[in-house]
Amino acid sequence: YNNNNKNNNNNDDGNINYQNTNEFKDNKKNMNFKNQYNNNYKFDENMNNSNTMHSRNSNVEEHLRNNSIDMNNSNINNYTNQQTRFSSFMENENENENKNYHTGGMNNNIHFKNKYDNNNSSMKNTDNNKTDTSYNMKGTINNDNNNMDYLRNINNINEYKGSAKNKFYTNYMNKNNLKFTQNNNDNMNINEDNNNNNNNNNNNNGVFSNYQNNNMNRNNSINIKRNLNNNNNINNNMNKMGSQDKNQNSNNNFYMNYNYQNRKNSMNNNMNNNMNNNMNHNMNNNMNHNMNNNMNHNMNNNMNHNMNNNMNNINSLDSDMSPNYHAHVKMSMMNYNNNESNTANPNQMNFEQTNNDNMKRENNNMNNYGYDDNTVHVNNNTPSTDFFSRAVGYNNNYLNNNNNMNSAVNNNSSNGNNMKNENSENKNVADNNDSLNNNKNNNNNINMNESINNNNTLNNNNEYNNQNNNEDEDDDDWGELGEDKYIDINSIMKKKNVILNQLEADLNDLSKKGNDGKNKKKNKMKKDDLFVLPHTN
């Protein structure tokens, strides 16, 4: 120690001035003790501390009585004129070696009894250079037994104060815990904001289009994932604080363990609250609002059947989950069952299934989470009313409900495919009928034209015969057109094919001519490029 080092550690016990002690040690050459029982004491007059014991063998209590200083009413933060100081210079008789010893630091709250023998001339559990004795420590010096006994007066010692090592560690812990606590508070605020955003999105569901509602639902799921991530950050912070407490080597164990237990309880409460919020928001959002948007106008008989199964699952949920959950969901489910619809949104259901998987994985992580060496796992000795046990049950019911909805989606998809196939077949039949009708019309036109051409050479005799046959038209088995006017479909189809082939040939010829013209134009352009003069300045 030197005068430049005041040994100020910025702790709660104030700044301790060691100047007098250092001056005393600097003048130790003038102390000519032949052994530790010698009463000769040479006091340095330069030491201005009026509360210094002038005799090594003086009794502490007697010294305090002779010095009229009220220790209990003094200012604890200023020890300059109130501390009882003495330092001794003793000679080890066996080793002929001089040793400097002291009684311990100020406000040292450790019970100790210091003995000196031939093999150990320094005190244990104290720093070897301090020479301060606390004003609130009383004791006696027993020369016969060659020891010094001190009894601690704990009435004037604050439990938050310890040795310098303990106070330094406590300050270090407080600073680090403050950092982790602030981080946890930030995470909790973010969780609250995310939950508020989810509530706002849920309140707006049904107002916008399905596309906008799906986007809001995705945002809700992202917020829930962020909440779970924040919970993991809280766990990590709590583990760091817990590991620091476990590794501490402090004598102030009661204070440290008390705070550690409080942080454990706080972590339990935070995790329970966050998991409750996440579970409730996830289930309310995904089951109620997504089903309302995606299925309210898109459910069929298969979906109604599955929704009835979901009603049974909902009735089995724990009533402790949410106060307003049952009535709201049940009424919504009843309304859904009364609506007519076709299909659910498969993409949205797949997206929600991913959320279910994430929540299931989070619950597994919570089952395996441990706070300390005495970890209480959900599957071991946790009571049945424990939150995490209920959360696993909620999640399983939720997954079962969504599995039913997914199966309904699959049924709807298959039904939709069947309907598409039927529609395509019907469309093909309709197209075939249209083509047949067109062919009939074309054939009729062709037949009529042929009839007109064939009848151009009719003479008066044919007209006369037709007039004579008018009386027998009612008995004609072939109808009003007569036998020669009957439509021959096979001949018409052959003629149609001939016409189509001719049209195809004409189109091919036109295409060929068009391509030839384009090629000639390209070749001409390339040829013209050969004669383009380069640009010159």
Swiss-Prot record:
Regions of compositional bias (Low complexity) in chain numbering: 336-347, 399-469
Top-level taxonomy: Eukaryota, Sar, Alveolata, Apicomplexa, Aconoidasida
Protein name: Asparagine-rich protein
Biased composition (Basic and acidic residues): 509-518
Positions of the UniProt region annotated as Disordered: 1-22, 187-254, 336-372, 399-479, 509-528
Keyword annotations from UniProtKB, A to Z: Malaria
Recorded coiled-coil stretches: none
Protein's UniProt keywords contain Ubl conjugation: no
Bias-annotated ranges (Acidic residues): 470-479
